[in-house]
Regions:
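Conserved substrate/cofactor phosphate-moiety recognition/catalytic segment
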Residues: 1-36
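Small-molecule kinase domains that catalyze NTP-dependent phosphoryl transfer to phosphate-bearing small molecules
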Residues: 71-129, 133-134
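Short, hinge-like loop/turn segments at secondary-structure boundaries
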Residues: 15-18, 60-62, 83-87
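Conserved ATPase-coupling elements of RecA-like P-loop NTPase cores
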Residues: 13, 53-54
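Conserved catalytic network of the ASCE P-loop NTPase/AAA+ motor domain
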Residues: 32-39, 58-63, 104-107
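Conserved phosphate-donor/acceptor-positioning beta-strand/loop module used by diverse small-molecule
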Residues: 42-44, 48, 60-80, 114
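Short beta-strand segments at enzyme active-site cores
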Residues: 1-2, 37-47
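Short, solvent-exposed loop/turn segments at secondary-structure junctions
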Residues: 7-9, 49-52
C-alpha cells in the first residue's frame, strides 16, 4: 500500500514527478525481490505516469505483472475521500494531488479495468477471478 511504504521505505520522497517515479521504482524493486522468493505480491499504489508503470512492469516476466486500472472519476474519489485529501486539494492546500493538481495518465492497455462507479463487491469478484485465472 502506498501509504504504508511512504511512512518507511519511501519516507524521504515527496510528490514531485521525480519523487513519484522513484516511489514506484522502489516498490517495484522490492516487489521483484519478494516475487523472486516465491511470494505472490499485490501492490496498491497511485502511479500517475505511464512511463513509471512501464518501468515497473519491465522488471517482471509478462505473466508475473498484472496491471489493474480502477477507473474512477475524480468527483467520485472526492465523494469517498476517507482521508480528506480531495478537500485539501480543493482548498489549495495539496497542490500535487493526482487527478487534481497533477495529471493522471490512464493505462493504454491494462490487464483488467474495474469501474470505480460500480458495485464494489462486483469489482472485488472480478479482481479475484482475474487473479485465479493468472
Amino acid at each position: 500500500d502506498g501509504d504504508n511504504v511512504r511512512t518507511g521505505l519511501n519516507k524521504d520522497l515527496g510528490f514531485t514527478p521525480e519523487d513519484r517515479a522513484e516511489n514506484v521504482r522502489r516498490v517495484a524493486e522490492v516487489s521483484k525481490l519478494m516475487r523472486d522468493s516465491g511470494v505472490v505480491v499485490f501492490v496498491a499504489l497511485v502511479s500517475p505516469y505511464r512511463s513509471d508503470r512501464e518501468t515497473a512492469a519491465s522488471l517482471f516476466v509478462e505473466s508475473e505483472f498484472v496491471e489493474v486500472f480502477v477507473d474512477t472519476p475524480v468527483d467520485i474519489c472526492s465523494e469517498r475521500d476517507p482521508k480528506g485529501l480531495y478537500a485539501k486539494a480543493a482548498a489549495g492546500n495539496l497542490p500535487n494531488m493526482t487527478g487534481v493538481g497533477q495529471i493522471y495518465e490512464p493505462p493504454v492497455s491494462p490487464d483488467l479495468i474495474l469501474r470505480g462507479t460500480g458495485d464494489l463487491e462486483a469489482s472485488a469478484n472480478l479482481l479475484v477471478a482475474a487473479i485465479l485465472e493468472a
